[in-house]
UniProtKB/Swiss-Prot annotation:
Gene (name only): pdxJ
Cell compartments where the protein resides: Cytoplasm
Protein name: Pyridoxine 5'-phosphate synthase
Organism: Nitrosomonas eutropha (strain DSM 101675 / C91 / Nm57)
EC number per UniProt: 2.6.99.2
Site note Transition state stabilizer, residues: 151
KW Transferase (keyword) present: yes
Domain of life per record: Bacteria
SUPFAM superfamilies hit by this protein: Pyridoxine 5'-phosphate synthase
Length: 241
């Protein structure tokens, strides 16, 4: 089976747009769990543009599945994670001016920093994942820093300008998923996946979990959050049938 991690960031984006206390990302997370989500993913960004510390603290107590906290590799965020102790943490690159995470974490360039963060988080009992581009050198670096999980960045696949380019990106993801799996890593994937492009990624047998958020929140505007989650989960399961 393949697992679905529902990212609730953009429920919080809508809330923050007007500075209200609704819509509640807490409620969205609980509805997602009831509707088939296997994990709840949320990104506490340094600029706090959507998810807030209070959201993380409340959800850590209320979730029945797993919390997958996305975080930059900074002292502030690593210390916060060690205090809250999510089930999983996915370390991601972060720039304040970006609309969304634009690429994978450069584990090679930031090797010492990532290695130290992995050690601290692991000692705190948190499973560490690294959000990386589908490249063998980055996967090898993830192994060397001691991360047991990687999340392959699917943005280049999703944003490819032509069907030929998209197919080439898919083949890269497929081969790198197999490579990482053969090296003993759990392989997750995510970024810019939606209802029209998820099936080929979900079909890759080495991939354990997909993290999807924006597309589900957008679909929920028309059919409701619970049904949007159920549709995505069904789509993923059918890819493996």
């Amino acid at each position: 089976m393949i697992a679905l991690g529902v990212n609730i960031d953009h429920v919080a984006t809508l809330r923050q747009a007007r500075g209200t206390d609704y819509p509640s990302p807490i409620k969205a997370a609980l509805v997602a769990e009831e509707s088939g989500a296997d994990a709840i993913t949320l990104h506490l960004r340094e600029d706090r543009r959507h998810i807030q510390e209070e959201d993380v603290i409340i959800l850590r107590e209320r979730l029945k599945t797993r919390m997958n906290l996305e975080s930059a590799v900074t002292e502030e965020m690593i210390s916060f994670a060690c205090r809250i102790k999510p089930h999983d943490i996915c370390l991601v690159p972060e720039r304040r001016e970006e609309l969304t995470t634009e690429g994978g974490l450069d584990v090679i360039r930031h090797f010492d920093q990532v290695s130290a963060a992995c050690k601290r988080l692991t000692e705190a009992g948190i499973r560490v994942s690294l959000f990386v581009d589908a490249r063998a050198d980055q996967i090898d670096a993830a192994i060397r820093v001691g991360a047991p999980v990687i999340e392959l960045h699917t943005g280049h696949y999703a944003d490819a300008a032509t069907s030929e380019a998209q197919q080439a990106e898919l083949e890269t993801i497929r081969s790198m998923a197999a490579y990482a799996f053969s090296r003993g890593l759990q392989v997750n994937a995510g970024h810019s996946l939606h209802y029209q492009n998820t099936t080929p990624i979900a079909f890759i047998p080495e991939i354990t979990e997909l993290n999807i958020g924006h597309a589900i929140v957008a679909r929920a505007l028309f059919i409701g959050f619970a049904q949007a989650v159920r549709e995505m989960k069904t789509l993923m399961q059918e890819a493996r049938a």
